[in-house]
């Protein structure tokens, strides 16, 4: 699978998967031995089981579905970057997340490495872009 196609599929599945809290749809995008860093300061989530646990924990803390939008991914070689904007709500209140995920894909179009970088602020800031 071409990396641009894989990256576009990744953004589409994350958009709907996050809103539906569909961990399995997102997990299927990752290679069996893929590694995901949700933050550069903690240990990575290893394999599909690690990503699944991370997503289930994250979704369990949401009190309503997250609304997320992703920009068209930027692709070079086997890597891609996808910027996103998400409006979340937790027991502590609403949050806006502005972030970017760096991705590396294998030849099957599955994610072998991903790194999230994000900035979080209290409240909901409307989507500033027309993605």
Regions from the PLM with identified roles:
Residues 35-46, 61:
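A short gly/proline-enriched turn/hairpin at secondary-structure junctions
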Residues 13-17, 36-37, 87-88:
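Alpha-helix C-capping/helix-to-loop hinge sites
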């Amino acid at each position: 699978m071409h990396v641009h196609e894989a990256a576009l599929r990744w953004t589409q599945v994350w958009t709907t998967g996050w809103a539906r809290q569909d961990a399995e749809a997102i997990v299927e995008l990752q290679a069996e031995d893929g590694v995901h860093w949700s933050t550069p300061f903690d240990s990575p989530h290893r394999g599909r089981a690690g990503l699944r646990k991370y997503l289930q924990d994250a979704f369990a803390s949401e009190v309503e579905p997250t609304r997320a939008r992703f920009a068209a991914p930027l692709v070079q070689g086997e890597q891609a970057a996808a910027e996103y904007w998400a409006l979340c709500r937790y027991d502590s209140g609403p949050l806006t997340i502005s972030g970017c995920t760096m991705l590396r894909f294998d030849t099957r179009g599955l994610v072998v490495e991903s790194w999230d970088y994000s900035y979080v602020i209290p409240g909901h800031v409307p989507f500033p872009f027309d993605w």
